[in-house]
Amino acid sequence: MKASAFVYPWDVVGDPGAAGRIAGLGVRQATLASAYHSTRALTPRHPRHRIVTAAHAAVLYPVDDARWEGRALRPYAAGEWAPGDAYGEAAGALAEAGLDVHTWVVLAHNSRMGAEHPSTSVVNAYGDRYAWAPCIAQADTRAYLVDLAVEAAVRPGALGTELESLGWYGLTHLHAHDKIGGVGLGDAGQYLMSLCFCAACRAGYGGHGLDADDLASAVREALEPVWRGDVPSEGGWPLVEKLLGGETAAATRVWREGVARSLQETVVAAVRAAAPTGFQVLLHADPVSYHCGANAGVDPGHILSVADGVVVPCTGGVGPLTPFAEQGRDAAVLAANFTVVSGMGGSPGTLADDAARAAAAGASELRLYHAGLASDGDLDAVRTVLTGPA
């Protein structure tokens, strides 16, 4: 089964041996970040540094100024963590090592944009703004995301792209010294806390028969027993319906899923129009369509009619593959994404068994997170699975 490893440009730039080491793992592809959010990343083998701090979301290549001239929303250039064309330099080294290179593009997740342009952010029913979560219902934000996807995905020499966060972002997000875990929200609470009440969403709810003020009040009322701990943290969509009312819950979902589907269709079409023939477009996806986050909630049948396939989180189990496999689209890529960094909850020692379970559940490829972050021991375990014992 084909495997690809996720990589950051700073893992490769300045380390002459990095590309060869990654190729030596037995992967055929490198999925290389070209647009990425803020992070603090370990580089345990780099000859010049051990910690890279990306201070804000940025593109990791020179911005095309002509594309963005006169626009308030535009990509930010990277700082010292990825100067110049860091993506291009890393991509060249990886290709020279014999790897196919695909871009890795993070889209609707940008805390700096939310700080500098607060009106772009998701606003919850209490009036709190989520700076990390651009509202994908807003016209200017959608236009920004489409052009960012085209520019960051179709880089010179790239054979395909993987689009992360192409959908709604909500409450869930690792934030600075995060302290919001005191109450277990579960799927239902997360959904209610992720409903947006910006001007665009308020109008959208109105188009589906909901008064936005009444809806916000209903959401706050529905959450009261959650804050008191009187509601189980699990329960999924049936609990959303119980807390908010079936018709109201359904109307919010129709609005939000329509917004996400149309954005996904528009972005994929724009990337394909800009890319050479055969360019592969995958989405990082969750088969539960009302979910938010890096793995966008999607309708499996719809997304496999739009994109060439999906990258599915499987570290916690391969169950999320099943709804995609059930669509019966033999040509679609179903990539099972496993964290192989032990210190981040991964289990590289069980990769062979995990991969076998993923294949049985319908996976056609593997994604391994992450070749730059993993320890030598973790990478040795991966290499053994992909290439056999030394």
Where in the sequence are the language-model features?
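Polysaccharide-binding and catalytic clefts of secreted carbohydrate-active enzymes
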Residues: 129-270, 285-287, 293-300
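Substrate-binding cleft/loops of secretory-pathway carbohydrate-active enzymes
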Residues: 171, 273-318
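Substrate-binding cleft of secreted/luminal carbohydrate-active enzymes
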Residues: 307-321, 337-390
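Short, acidic/polar
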Residues: 10-24, 139-152, 290-305, 321-322, ...
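Catalytic domains of carbohydrate-active enzymes, especially glycoside hydrolases
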Residues: 16-43, 151-160, 300-313, 360-364
